[in-house]
Amino acid sequence: MDPSDFPSPFDPLTLPEKPLAGDLPVDMEFGEDLLESQTAPSRGWAPPGPSPSSGALDLLDTPSGLEKDPGGVLDGATELLGLGGLLYKAPSPPEVDHGPEGTLAWDSGEQTLEPGPGCQTPEVMPPDPGAGASPPSPEGLLEPLAPDSPIILESPHIEEEIPPLATRRRGSPGQEEEHTQGQPQSPNAPPSPSVGETLGDGINSSQSKPGVCTPTAHPSLPGDGLTGKEIEKPPERVQKRSERVRRAEPPKPEVVDSTESIPVSDEDSDAMVDDPNDEDFVPFRPRRSPRMSLRSSMAQRAGRSSMGTKMSCAHCRTPLQKGQTAYQRKGLPQLFCSSSCLTTYSKKPLGRKTCTFCKKEIWNTKDSVVVQTGPGGSFHEFCTSVCLSLYEAQQQRPIPQSGDPADATRCSICQKTGEVLHEVSNGSVVHRLCSDSCFSKFRANKGLKTNCCDQCGAYIYARPGGLGPELLFHDGQQKRFCNTTCLGAYKKKNTRVYPCVWCKTLCKNFEMLSHVDRNGKTSLFCSLCCTTSYKVKQAGLTGPPRPCSFCRRSLSDPCYYNKVDRTVYQFCSPSCWTKFQHTSPEGGIHLSCHYCHSLFSGKPEVLEWQDQVFQFCCRDCCEDFKRLRGVVSQCEHCRQEKLLHEKLRFSGVEKSFCSEGCVLLYKQDFTKKLGLCCITCTYCSQTCQRGVTEQLDGSTWDFCSEDCKTKYLLWYCKAARCHACKRQGKLLETIHWRGQIRHFCNQQCLLRFYSQQNQPNLDTQSGPESLLNSQSSESKPQTPSQTKVENNHTVRTPDENGNLGKTPVKRATPSVPTPPPPPPPATPRKNKAAMCKPLMQNRGVSCKAEMKSKGSQTEEWKPQVIVLPIPVPIFVPVPMHLYCQKVPVPFSMPIPVPVPMFLPTTLESTEKIVETIEELKVKIPSNPLEADILAMAEMIAEAEELDKASSDLCDLVSNQSAEGLLEDCDLFGTARDDVLAMAVKMANVLDEPGQDLEADFPKNPLDINPSVDFLFDCGLVGPEDVSTEQDLPRAMRKGQKRLMLSESCSRDSLSSQPSCTGLNYSYGVNAWKCWVQSKYANGETSKGDELRFGPKPMRIKEDILACSAAELNYGLAQFVREITRPNGERYEPDSIYYLCLGIQQYLLENNRMVNIFTDLYYLTFVQELNKSLSTWQPTLLPNNTVFSRVEEEHLWECKQLGVYSPFVLLNTLMFFNTKFFGLQTAEEHMQLSFTNVVRQSRKCTTPRGTTKVVSIRYYAPVRQRKGRDTGPGKRKREDETILEQRENRMNPLRCPVKFYEFYLSKCPESLRTRNDVFYLQPERSCIAESPLWYSVIPMDRSMLESMLNRILAVREIYEELGRPGEEDLD
């Protein structure tokens, strides 16, 4: 039948909102007036009408009764009689007694109906208070009864005749469709629906067309007249929201957004989700569709008319006897014989039919199809016609032939033969499972992690939009659910009520916060306020009770605590605790932690999750928040779902990791995949392929793109702007914010940026949400006198969240009936997020995740223990005989053990070593005793010779008459070093305050101070020594090679012998003391003259060893500027350099290991000395020699030449390059490179034979040699100058070739092929054992000039340049 054939009132879209059968008024309790009404009008109870005294029903005089309301409902029996136009005699009403307990007692009786002309089968109508009988008093109707109150039934059997064309709406919610005629009713159906239909009001009666009479027979209630109280209209029925929801259409599963939280009251929450533990819990049953086929309705009415209405217990099916006490649950029409049957029936599981083909539960019964099909011809029910077609096609499909058909359909778990529900392919084997339980067992046995729902067991398919399943952490495990319905069902099933540990408030476990203490005990709290108070209490930080820190009231019990910046605050209530969180106690910029809600002013720990940014005060709060909110993601390396540890970007894609180990392993694999082109971007820190490379200030940076390079250079050049204050300059703070790099001036700007991002100003918005933002969430409810009653009889009162809501109230109306007002419109909510904000803090934390401890158990975190045996001496007492017998005593005896020694040597020295060993074998006899005697004799002889030589030298020095003999003595032998040492010691004795360096060592040798005449008498110092040649490598021409090589061996013996005096440090120390004494001779110096180190003045000490590094730095700088001779004249720059070298040697000999010429602490002194030496020019003596008081030997003595440090090695290389290559300017030194300075070795012939000579050659650039080569072609090639340094074989410690090789070994290997750099800057953090001493940054010009000025003050530099054959270099 087409739905359009039905009249419009039966259209489900146009049905009015009416109460259904089984719903009682809110003031009527269980069991009272049960059989009075199955349905009630939405406007309340029908008003009483006139009561005829004869008890008969009169006809309507006017056709006004034909007017119907839009819902098609006829109120009162007078309107029904007006439709038929006939008069029927009403039967005598049964006697109704109101017992003392409010039960209804009535007698049974046969009700006869006489059909009139033109009428169909008569229908039994419900009683009407206005149809000639007095209605019961409102007090009797509204008298409350206890739940499950008994009902005394006196006549349980009533027969009913139903017209076949009447269409009825079943009143009980969730009641299934009636079976056809001839089928018994199901146990879940009401046992006697005719009772409600017989004794209800006339609302459910069908509409009648004009000309069709609907005779009714209805018993009237007792009462002959109406009192004033009875005439009054009963109070308007107030419907709860829970009743409205249960009477609504079958609900569809809603998808609840977990990010939004709508404030609901306790009543609303009970209406939305029913608790099976509640007494009024009604299992969900789909309501029968109001549009039934005509055939099914006729069959139902025919079946009802043929069978009696004898009532029985809905559980045990026991017939109810007359006068027996019946039990009924509120809102349900079923009757029970005892309380046990009522309780057992309420706990029965919900029975639903399943589809034969797809095995799913049939929810919508109107679309179901019942057919007789299959091989056995039995009846099967399908959810849709599609399943029926698929089932028939499956039955017609030929069955494949197999060897054993039983094995093909046998379950792999329970080994039962039947239908296969699941097929699992594990490897190459296909497992068939018959049920969900077997599927769960299979997953447990195989250890499979299938994405199945933990509530219903169904497989969770991928949701649209890439959304994953619903997740919930409960009891330390992660639960998965296919939808929000299963999630709600799981919560309802596992909900428990526990008291808060702090405030003892009862709360549900899914709404509480858990805290695990040090002992592993878990405590539950109702809010963060109680959690924080408990932590402060456990830490022992609570002091004596004080007034509330917010409202200054006295504290209640329990009081609440909070700790902010090492200060504990006390509060009287959670509201004061919450309000205090939004205020800054110190007035600065403070952020609120998203976990503990405490204020902090440091750099926050940031977490980005689901397009939101969360801030935390510390790392611990961030980790707890991740476990609490279930911040779980799939690790990119191990592919397991764990807590999120870190998010990193690889080639522009953000990837999640569960631990630092997974980050390192994934980065290692990623680097191997990309190879050498894999870099980490200097700006955005992502690992990707190299895009752009930039070099600046000696540093090389790699970037992923040109954009990152531009932004980084702006930040590096201090041209970027702060994202908070928009200022341009040096930005110290850098963060990653939503995939972008943000820079800030300092931490204050960073905090201001965070506070602006997460705390919008809601007070500037218009609407009621601004008021909600300013009002407190703990405002007291208004008194009834302050509430405003509106026209729709609702009162606006603040709910538990501080929001104004509508609460229905009872209103006593006068006796004159007034039409009810229309339903009020829905209240618009302008700012839904602002109204939900107070609830987001409490409902957002459903349960605390405790998977950290459980997750870490899968990893091998315990280190591997290795047993290491350690010998421990143990004293074992040995019994002795008290010295009466011989006792063994340990005795040590040395045993020679041959130990092989490997001596590093070369091929040249191997033969000499073998010869020396042979000589020792010949020299040392085979008898060890004889060898010891010979060795002792040699030692005694050598000692006697040394004593004799020293005594002769002392006599020679003390003898004044041996002056002529001293002049002829060869003091250039081995004894000269001893004489030099003696001279230095003697010079130290001359510690007089009036020492004058330039007077003792004048430019003219004839003006020598008599106090040091003995030095010249001993031959230590002489004018002829100034021009003494040393055999050291120097530049030469090609034509002079053979001459130089032939003479090299003869001069090798003289190359290591110095021709100068030793450095006398007493001049420098005495000059320092005299300068300090003269500086402070006249008391304190003026403020302009005194030295200052920062804001404090500095006083120089006379003892140079007692001065600190800063005092020595500034003191030496002023010493260089102010030092003068005793006669007041200014010292020459070379003399000042000599004095400073003496101070350096004095510091070293007194174990003060500093270098005042190279250390960075003495930069001020070095700059001042450089200014003095830069203007100095050497003095040419009358004998055409250059005079300088600084000699090469002085530099060796005070460790300015050698390999003591990287700077000293550089100074040594520059000294040799200046001395032998003739490079006297910084430009010439900067032209040196690793490619034009080459080490070469060649063989040459000497009078002693053929020898191998190793040297360093410098091939100067072409532009340097262009001006020097002026002759014709052949002559030009012959006179071409070769700059060369040859090795010093007699003294390898001063060999330039060895220094050059050592310098190459300490330089980076990548720079050894460079043609633009030679001198490199030392590494700041290198030590002597470091493999590299120098960086890739070349020395700057200023440092080279400072070192070169000190080298050019040495006398030997000019002596080497003035040798024959060097004139072509100028």
Swiss-Prot record:
The modification Phosphothreonine is found at residues 797, 818, 827. GO terms for cellular component: nucleoplasm; nucleus. Residues 816-827 have a biased composition (Pro residues). GO terms for biological process: cytoskeleton organization; regulation of cell morphogenesis. Residues 265-281 have a biased composition (Acidic residues). It is found in: Nucleus. It holds the Pfam family DUF3504. Residues 1-73, 85-310, 761-831 are annotated as: Disordered. Residues 761-789 have a biased composition (Polar residues). One of its GO terms (molecular function) is zinc ion binding. Residues 227-255, 790-799 have a biased composition (Basic and acidic residues). Keywords: Isopeptide bond, Metal-binding, Nucleus, Phosphoprotein, Repeat, Ubl conjugation, Zinc, Zinc-finger. A zinc finger (MYM-type) spans 334-368, 380-424, 431-466, 479-513, 523-561, 569-606, 614-648, 655-694, 701-735. Ubiquitously expressed in all embryonic stages and adult tissues. Residues 1-12, 40-56, 130-146 have a biased composition (Low complexity). The keyword Membrane does not apply. SMART domains: TRASH. Plays a role in the regulation of cell morphology and cytoskeletal organization. May be a component of a BHC histone deacetylase complex that contains HDAC1, HDAC2, HMG20B/BRAF35, KDM1A, RCOR1/CoREST, PHF21A/BHC80, ZMYM2, ZNF217, ZMYM3, GSE1 and GTF2I. This is Zinc finger MYM-type protein 3.
